[in-house]
A protein has these predicted regions:
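Conserved GNAT acetyl-CoA-binding A-motif
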Residues: 112-126
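Conserved catalytic-core motifs of GNAT/GCN5-like acyltransferases
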Residues: 12, 120-124, 134, 139-154
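Conserved GNAT-fold acetyl-CoA-binding loop/helix
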Residues: 26-53
Length: 159
C-alpha cells in the first residue's frame, strides 16, 4: 500500500514557540469552538492560554508541548499536563484534514506509553473535536459537561 510521506515536522516546543503556538490556538479556537461558547467560556479559555503560571510551567518542563511545523510556521500544537491529560490540541485551519492532529496525537501517545509508562490518556473534548477523537480511538467516559461557559465531553483512550 502506498503511504504518502508526512510533509511536516513534529518536535518538542521551545520557549520561542510559545507565543506563536498560543496565537494559532486562539485563532483556531475562535473559528471553530468560540461560536459555541458563552462570552464567559471564551474569556476563561483566553485566560488559560495567556496565564503566566502556565507559561512558567512550560519553561520548567512541567507542561509538555509538541508542535507541528511547516518550515518555520507552527501549524499545530498538542500539550499534556498532570502526566497523561491532553490539555490542548489545535491545528491551524489551513492544515485541517492533512493528518496533522492525528500525527501529533500519535507521537504524544507513543511518548506517554514508551517513555512515561502511561497506560491511558484523558482529555475533555470540545463539541467540534469529539468526532475526531472518536475516530482515533477515544471514548466518552461521561456525558457532555457545561461549566464556566465551557462545553466539554470527558474522554479516554488506552495506550
Amino acid at each position: 500500500m502506498y503511504q504518502e510521506e508526512f510533509p511536516y515536522q513534529i518536535r518538542w516546543a521551545e520557549a520561542e514557540d510559545w507565543t506563536p503556538a498560543m496565537n494559532m490556538i486562539w485563532k483556531t479556537f475562535m473559528k471553530f469552538e468560540g461560536p459555541e461558547y458563552t462570552s464567559e467560556g471564551i474569556r476563561n479559555f483566553l485566560d488559560f492560554i495567556t496565564d503566566e503560571d502556565l507559561f512558567h510551567s512550560f519553561l520548567q518542563g512541567k507542561y509538555l508541548m509538541l508542535v507541528a511545523t511547516d518550515g518555520a510556521q507552527i501549524i499545530g500544537a498538542a500539550s499534556v499536563r498532570d502526566g497523561n491529560h491532553l490539555s490542548l490540541l489545535f491545528v491551524d485551519e489551513r492544515y485541517h484534514r492533512q493528518g496533522v492532529g492525528k500525527r501529533l496525537m500519535s507521537y504524544l501517545c507513543e511518548i506517554l506509553k514508551k517513555e512515561a509508562g502511561r497506560e491511558d490518556i484523558t482529555l475533555k473534548a470540545a463539541p467540534y473535536a469529539v468526532p475526531f477523537y472518536r475516530k482515533i480511538g477515544f471514548w466518552a467516559t461521561g456525558p457532555e459537561e457545561h461549566y464556566s461557559g465551557i462545553i466539554v465531553t470527558p474522554m479516554r483512550k488506552r495506550l
